[in-house]
Curated annotation (Swiss-Prot):
SUPFAM superfamilies: alpha/beta knot. It comes from Hahella chejuensis (strain KCTC 2396). It is found in: Cytoplasm. Belongs to the RNA methyltransferase RlmH family. Keywords: Cytoplasm, Methyltransferase, rRNA processing, S-adenosyl-L-methionine, Transferase. This is Ribosomal RNA large subunit methyltransferase H.
């Protein structure tokens, strides 16, 4: 099973790449975490945010495999504790499907992306900056994996 983080945006600060990559290299070979960056359309003064969101959504959907289990990261989604995330991860692994985690642009995910999603997950009721989301996701996925392995990284 591969986990794909499909995120709108690019050119992250060095601390983001360093933090994200630290957890990517810790993930097991049979459950790699792959980042797919979707270029963000230029946002000009007169640009229609709704059209930009649709355009971003089309690019995200093109990045998906037909058999991917899609999880949209949405504020309105279901929140999981870290142990619950590890249980989700085990279910994903048992399904044999690749998992695609979708992170929208500044205006969120398009309706088409939300409709394609098998699940909606809320990391927090707070609005989180996109760079921080990448690092947070990578760390939480690694932490969930360590729970499944009985590794002492996670403590309750």
């Amino acid at each position: 099973m591969r986990i794909k983080l499909i995120a709108v945006g690019g050119k992250m600060p060095g601390w983001v790449e360093q933090g994200y990559n630290e957890y990517v290299k810790r993930m097991p070979r049979d459950m790699p975490l792959q980042l797919i960056e979707i270029p963000m359309p230029r946002r000009q003064k007169n640009a229609d945010p709704h059209k930009l969101k649709i355009q971003e959504g089309e690019s995200i959907l093109q990045s998906l495999g037909s058999g991917d289990h899609v999880v949209a990261l949405e504020v309105e989604g279901k929140s999981w504790s870290t142990p619950q995330l590890s249980q989700q991860m085990e279910r994903w692994r048992m399904s044999g499907q690749d998992v695609a985690l979708l992170v929208g642009g500044p205006d969120g995910l398009s309706d088409a992306c939300r409709a394609r999603a098998n699940q909606q997950w809320s990391l927090s009721p707070l609005t989180l900056p996109h760079p921080l989301v990448r690092v947070l996701l990578a760390e939480q996925l690694y932490r969930a994996w360590t729970i499944l392995q009985g590794h002492p990284y996670h403590r309750e």
